[in-house]
Amino acid sequence: MKKHIASTLFLSLLSILQLTAQSHSVKKLGIEQGLSNNYVVSITQDKQGFLWFATEEGLNKFDGTRFITYYKNDLPHNNQGITGNELNRVYADSKRPIIWIATQRDGLNAYNYDEQTFTAYQHNPENPHSLITNDVTDISPSTQNDDGLWVS
C-alpha cells in the first residue's frame, strides 16, 4: 500500500512539473543572419528589448529579425561614429537610453539610441579627469552613484 501511495504521489508530482515546465527555443545567430563577426565578446539588452552584441568587428543591434551593424567611420548612422571596431564589452544603462561600449585601444563610447548619436571618451594626457587608458576592458554600474560607471 505504501508503495502504491508513493508511486501515485511521484507520478502526480511528475505530471505537475510537466505542466509548469516552459519550453525554451534556441535561435542560432551568426554571420549568416547578419552578425558582423561570430566572435561575440559581450551581449546586453536595452530598455526597448533590443539585443546588442560586441564583437571583434563592430557593434551589432538585433531587433528580433535582423542585425544593424555599427562600424568605425560608419557615418550614415550618425555624425561622429564609434571610435573602434574591436570591442571588449557592451552595457545597457538601466536609467538612460545609452549603450556603453568598451573598445580595445579606442576608449569608451556611449551610444544614445533615442538620438542615434555616439559620444567618445578617450584618454587625454592634458586632462587628469579623462580615461587613464584607451584600452577599456570592462564596464559596471556604480552602486554608490545612480549615474556612475566603473570602467577598467
Question: Where are the predicted features?
Answer:
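Carboxylate-rich, polar loop motifs that coordinate divalent cations or form catalytic acidic clusters
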Residues: 1-152
